[in-house]
Structures are given as C-alpha cells and as structure tokens.
Amino acid sequence: MVKYISYGIKKEDSDEENYEYFEKEVHLDKFITLTLINEEEYLKEKNNRIGFITYDSLNIKKKDGVIVLPCEESMVVYKDTEEDNEEEEYEYYTYVGQIESINKYILSGSYYEAWDAVLVDKKTGISEKILDIPYLLPDKKHMFCITPSLYEESTDFSLYSINEANKIEKIFETTFTKWQCYDVENMKDTIFVSKNGYLYVPVIHSSFFWEDIDKKQCQYLKIGLKK
C-alpha cells in the first residue's frame, strides 16, 4: 500500500482546460477506503454488479485506421498512425462503447509503452483522457480507474469527479507498489462496481505477478469513497 498520494491543485488564475499540478503529501484515506474482504463477500457482490457501458462497437467501426464519432455539434475523428512511423509516435485507437448516463463515447488508446482511455462528449465532441477504462459509481458523480503497470509490477489508481455538465476532473492519482490486479487479461470480468457503490478488485502481491495464474494467491479488495 502507499501512505501518501499526489493530487492536483488548480491555481486561481487557471482556466478549466489548463491545470497546474503540485506535489503535496496527503493521506490516502482522505478520499477513499480500502478493505480486505473474503471470497464469499466478493462473489456475493458480483451478483449485484452494475453494467454502465453500452458495448456497441458494431455501430461505430474503424475503417482504414480511422474512427469517426458523430456528436451533436461536430464530427470527431481519431486516426491511427502509420506502421512505418517512429515507435515514439505510435498511436492506435479502439472504439469501446459509450456511457449513456454521462453522455460519453469511450475509446482505448495505445501508444509507445503507454495506454489510456479517451472519453468524448457526445454533444460537444470535447475529449478528455483518463487513466484507463473507467468504473462509474452509482451516484454518476464519480468514477474510479485502475490499471496494472506491467513493467513496474504495481497498480495505478485514480479517482475522478463528474460535474453537472458532465465534465471530468481528476481528484487524485496514485500507485500501489505492493499489489497487482489478479488475472489482468480478464479484468473486464473480474473487477466490477456493485450496487452498493464499492469497487471490487481481486489482487495479488506484486512478487507473485509473473507466476502461473493457478499458483497466484488471490485476495480481494473493496474500494469505496470516503464518507
């Protein structure tokens, strides 16, 4: 676990599109709670998981490396870089679906030794990059992102807020150095938000990450907003 995190502070003279971030030590439990639970509770809440993404990739298809997103005020285009480009300039986009409750398209972006997710507003066409595919909470005002850092054998985690205009703002981002997501190839099935508003994550100690999946000692975390 980490004891402190870094989070963003917006200067008074900064506009909403231009943030300046500063390092400041704050306790993690200022924002979230993390609870180790047993497998029985995890499986029980898995029956109450919330499906908030509409996977409609058959409706929006990539053609010749180009994805076109129809928005009310504009058409938004995402184009992959050519294969003969320098590796450092590599960009590859995949349409994932949409989150109808906050009026966003979702794309996953792959780059040279990096990846993220892109949320595109279906009205304005304005895009916002976030850590990874999000987990929207039932209040529709917050979302978590969690993604494994394979090279560092750690886990990156972030919390975002959503205002009335559906604008996304990052509250904090941190790295957990002692645990990894269990079975990273199936995170879509194993990590979920329940109706009770908590994120449920199977985890393992980082030292077991490269072992065969059957030998990994899986535990379960329940992550929620600080009340």
Features from the language model and the residues they span:
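Conserved blade-ending motifs and adjacent loop-strand segments that build the rim/top face
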Residues: I171-D189
